[in-house]
Amino acid sequence: MNEDNHESSSSGCDNQIEFLVSEAEQRRRRVNHLDTEVHGLGYDPFSYCGRRVHVLLLTKLISVLTIPFYVAIIIFISFFGNATSVMFSVIILGSVLISTCYGAFRGAKMCLIPFVIIQLVFLIYDLILITILLLAVVFPKMFLSALLRLPLEDIPFGTDQVLLGCSLLLALLLAPLVWTTHVVYIDFLFISQVDETLHMLKEANQKVSQDDVSPNRMMF
């Protein structure tokens, strides 16, 4: 009787092992098939420059290159703002910079969110400034236009040329703002996908471990 139970439990264990192996093989074939299709199409949503540069590397470069950009903003505010605005800019930009560098180099996706938010704020602020400068050029008799032209009266250049030049410089910042925000957001999606995959693998390993333990209990 015990031998029959031992044989039945052994056969059940063998069947479970064969089922797990066959299921893993089918998953491996599906992954290989999808990977072959992706390589055949030459498309990778997490790579740039012909799949030569990964989004992780780009995010690290962006986190480092934003340091002089944020420093320039703080210096600009120190010339035209008061001590309170400088203090708040140092606190906000410094915390965002530290969070972005940590998230880029440590793979912490939640630390990348402040960078995306402040980039969107910069983008909206840039668009508003461009609109104001263009309105000041198109409608020179507006009260806002008079306020903008008053500090420019002593400049040897024409006020319209100065306003158009400033709007052009602000327009040139739109592309870097949009691109860096896009790259960091894609990195956020990549880290989320990696975390989800690792969580699924952990659950699969726990399930396999439970399936391996249960036949041993039956045999005992």
UniProtKB/Swiss-Prot annotation:
Transmembrane segments: 61-81, 85-105, 115-135, 150-170
Topology within the bilayer: Multi-pass membrane protein
Record localization: Membrane
Keywords: Membrane, Transmembrane, Transmembrane helix
Gene Ontology CC annotation, any one: membrane
UniProt name for this protein: Uncharacterized protein B0416.3
Lineage, broadest ranks: Eukaryota, Metazoa, Ecdysozoa, Nematoda, Chromadorea
